Structure formats: C-alpha cells, structure tokens
Amino acid sequence: MIPPHEFSAERVVFDALGVALSALPDDTPIAIAYSGGLDSTVLLHAAARIAGAGRCIALHVHHGLSANADAWLAHCAETAQALGARFDAARVDVPRASGQGIEASARDARYRALETMCARYGARTLWLAQHADDQAETVLLQLLRGAGIAGLAAMAPQYRPALADVVRMRPLLHLLRAQLERYAQQHALRWIDDESNTDTRYARNALRVDVLPALAPHFPGFRDALARTAQHAAAAQRLLDDLAAIDLRAVARADVRVLSRDAFVALDDERGANLLRYWMRSLGLPGASAARLAEMVKQLRAARDAHALRVDHAGWRLRLYRDDVQWEAGDGAASEAARADVADDDAADARDDRADASAAARLPACALAWRGHEVWRLPGWRGSFVFSPVAAHEHDAVPEALLSSAALRACARAGGERMRTWQGGPGRTLKNLFQERGVPAWQRDVPLLYVGERLLFVPRIGVNRATHDGADAPGGWRRIEWRPDMLIA
C-alpha cells in the first residue's frame, strides 16, 4: 500500500490502472461499475484517460433506495457523456424481506444487473472501484462476524464467480481513499455523496464512521496489517480449494454435479465440509455458514434413504437417491405424478401414475411455433429445450419437418403417459421407464414435449418412437435436449 504523500495521486492511480490494463487484450471493452460516488468517479475518469473513452462503458444501477436515486442517474449519464464514455443503467428492486439484510440484497441485485449489462455490450471485464480502506473494513467486518478463511480473504484483486462470464477486477484495491480524494481534487471532479453512507445502523458504515478513525491514532498501519491478513487468508483458501478439488475428483461421479454418498462419508467432518463448500461454489450456489455445512455433513452420514435427508439452501434442496447426492431446485411446483413416484418408487405392485390435473397445471403448458429455434427457454420450469443440428443417422435425431408440422407444447406430467423407446417396441409408462434408468423421483417433474397432441420427447428418457419411428425425411435434423438452468448458466 502506497502512503498518500509519497507520489502524486495521478501517478499512483494511472500506474494502478496501467497494471490492470496490461492484463487485457487490446481494444476489448472495459465495463466500469459507476455509482457516481468519489471512488467510481475517479476510476471512470482515469480509465477514460489511459484506456481511451471509447473502450469504457459506465454502468449504473438504480436501486430506488434513496429519494435522490433519479438525480444520481442523471448525474452519472451526464458525466459519462462529458468524458466520451458509453453509458447504460438498470433499475432493480431490492427485496427488503429476503432474510439476508438490505445491504446484502442490494449488493446481489447490483451484481446481477451489472453482469446483465456487461453481456449486452460483450464486455468480459468489469472494473470495480473498491480501495484499501474498503478492504480494511471488509476484513474487520468478517473478523467480527466470526468468518472463516474464505471470508477473511475479503475482496480479491481479480475474481470470476463460478459459472460467470465476467471477470471482476479491482485495480484500486491497494490505494487509499485519501489518494483518490487528491486525484479528484486535482482534476476538479464532481461526485455524489450517498446519504446512507453515514447511517451507522449499517455495520460497514459503523466501522467506517466510528471504529476505524479511533484505530488510526493507536495503530497507524492497521490498513496494511489487515491487507496482509487478507492475503494470508487468500493463500490458505487456495490450499483448501486444492484439497477440495482432489476430494471432488475422488467423490464425484462422471457428472461433477453428483457425488457418491459412500465415498463422501469416508472423509472426516472438516474435510467433508470443505468439499461441500467448494462443490457448491463450483455449481454457482450461494455459500453456506459453517453451522449449515456441519448439518449437511451430519445428515449425509446418517441418511439411509431419500426421505431421511432434509437440507434446503437458498431455494435448492440436497437430495439422496440410492448412492447419488445432488442439488435440485427446491421451490418449483412438483406435479402430482412426481409426488406419487416418491411415495411408492420401488413398490413391487407399483401402480400407474394418477394425478389431479389441477395440481399438474401449477406450471402451465407453454406453446411454440417452431421455426428453426435452437433454444426454447421455459422460465417456469427453470430450464430450456435445446434443438441442436445433427446428421440424420445420429441417435434420437428428429426431422425438422416434424418439429414444424404443428405447435410444440411443453406440459407437466398428468400421470399414465406411455411411450415407445424403440421402433416396434411396446408402449410403457413413463414411471417404469424412469425407474429403469435410475432417475430419482424428484427429477421426473420435467416438461413433456408434444408436437400437436402427440408426445414427442421426454427429458431423461428420449424420443417417443410412437411419434417418430426413425424413418427418413427431407430437410434438416435436430437432437432435442432438456437443460436445467444450472447447466445453461
């Protein structure tokens, strides 16, 4: 960390951005999170100077949490225009009753909006304006919360979240706020002051306003010391991640979204919790507390069947089927047919599925006039049908002429549906086919794809040969896949 008096503010800011810029391919767009405050104003101004305003895209998120939010949006648009940078903004609704606090909810909403805007401009790099004072606040806040190694590592200079396309970079992380203030003064910059930054009801503000100023006279180097703590924690976390990666290779199936319970319980509790944390992060799931991870390990050790495992986390549910452990969406509306499968999955006298149509209709049928679509997104089902071009001889290839012959419909299971999995074979119930393939009951709540009134495709089973018998047809061919959102992301 460079003391504010050692070099000119402009030099240290330009040097910091120059290092970040050297890591990027020439002429790639640089997205900059621009709130209009001091820090992001300095970042945008300096980036426009050294990278060229044409490469910079100022992205503003309107949270609607302040009565001044509209004025801030207008200020940011005007400033970006004056610098010659492109500008975009997004309005978000921050859930106040999400259970994670208004600060965390606003942060999550902001990052989602920023990544959406980055995708709009093809930007793979997002510059954030956090500095050394922010890092000190973060480390201290994590210490007071009793965070583990990952929390103490605080903010990384460069980071790409799991399943994300955008790399987050913090080129100012080793600079002090005082240096940014001097830069802003030297260039007569104008910025906005968010009145909420002085509200000490928020934990971070309380540290900034009341605690850190009291530390400075007695521990003048506390920012450097806390930054070193973050660096040590980050190094330790990398070692834990390396260990977890080794364990994941040993415990996971060929599909890394599925773990072997028997292999998992061979690990000790600490190693098991470390693996779960790493696995969840690799899948893009929100992190869990140490207590929550310990409960997951405990239940996985004790569970002997699917009914004994009761773990819900952030809208997802940890499931056990035979020896397979995996996460499934936990808040979707399950069809009655899938519920019946759970009740008597392996009973010798398993009856045909029967269901109340009104229950299955919780997820309404969707229709598509297919005209060469490659992806049909179904938000209510948390997934998409994908139609990939293939050769006619490939397995489960379907002629495009059939797909466009009538409207495609995606419907919930009603119970009792039958299909043929090979030409000339007998019609069999979906339930029996699912069981034969070892598909867990909760994974059977999938949309069935119809062409007109004929069942064409069932996820995890394949094409219904009663509808398409494999005969030659003119034109192109497609393979149909069902991809849950966690695979698309």
From Swiss-Prot:
InterPro entries: Lysidine-tRNA-synth_C (IPR012796), Rossmann-like_a/b/a_fold (IPR014729), TilS/TtcA_N (IPR011063), tRNA_Ile_lys_synt (IPR012094), tRNA_Ile_lys_synt_N (IPR012795), tRNA_Ile_lys_synt_subst-bd (IPR015262). Its EC number is 6.3.4.19. One of its GO terms (molecular function) is tRNA(Ile)-lysidine synthase activity. It is found in: Cytoplasm. The keyword Transit peptide does not apply. SUPFAM superfamilies: Adenine nucleotide alpha hydrolases-like, MesJ substrate recognition domain-like, PheT/TilS domain. Keywords: ATP-binding, Cytoplasm, Ligase, Nucleotide-binding, tRNA processing. Belongs to the tRNA(Ile)-lysidine synthase family. NCBIfam families: lysidine_TilS_C, lysidine_TilS_N. This is tRNA(Ile)-lysidine synthase.
